[in-house]
Amino acid sequence: AAWNLAMKDSGDRLVAAWAIMGVGGLASVPVLAALGPPPSAALGWLGVSVCIHVGYALALARAYELTDLAVAYPVARGTAPLLVTIGGVTLLGDSIAPLGVVGVVVVSAALMSMMRRGSLAGYRWAVLTGLFIAGYTLSDGAGVRAGDDAIRYIAVLFVLQTLVLSVVVLRMRGSGAMAAAVRAQPLRLTLAGLGGVTAYLLVLIA
């Protein structure tokens, strides 16, 4: 949540997302150099995940431009497990306990109630962000299992997504805006980036 707050408080949310994710990419370079890439079995999932993570950054930035953090963040984070659960049941044949059904209903009702608190466009972008979160949750989990090494997997993921997102943001915003964002709050963006990559690594290891 800390890096989401730093992103929301920035003048340009997309550039802030790039800077924060870029910190994770830079921090991952020495790890990648020391350990090397993950096994080839994980590379396909890495390609999928890079695309999803970049889409996530774009959608989240747009959501924060259109609505408040108090709406966008819970909607995005609440939508993701809901979609993962529904997708697991409908597409993968997973079973769900009665208590899980109750949880799905409660989360769905809570998400619907959030529609009245912000703009409809912002709500839609927040839901799309949740879809991307669900997507990379599934693809990264599969990639880690395929490569059997979460640290090497996430090192390559963060380096690649930084490279791709840098190209996208450079074309959309320009180098001047990117440099200005880094100069404006270097310490906060650095701490947010390091916190984000550490938290996500712990999630994948767990």
What are these regions (language model features)?
Residues 27-44, 87-99, 142-151, 205-206:
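Helix-coil boundary and interhelical linker segments in multi-pass alpha-helical membrane proteins
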Residues 1-51, 57-67, 116-127, 159-205:
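Membrane-interface interhelical linkers
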Residues 22-28, 85-89, 96-115, 131:
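Hydrophobic transmembrane alpha-helices of multi-pass small-molecule transport proteins
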Residues 121-145, 149-152:
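Selected transmembrane alpha-helices and immediately adjacent juxtamembrane segments
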Residues 16-17, 72, 153:
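Juxtamembrane helix-start motifs in multi-pass secondary transporters
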Residues 19, 48, 75-76, 99-102, ...:
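Hydrophobic core positions of alpha-helical segments in small-molecule transporters
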Residues 20, 24, 73-80, 129, ...:
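Structural signature of transmembrane alpha-helices in multi-pass secondary transporters
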Residues 60-99, 113:
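Membrane-interface helix-loop-helix junctions at boundaries between adjacent transmembrane segments
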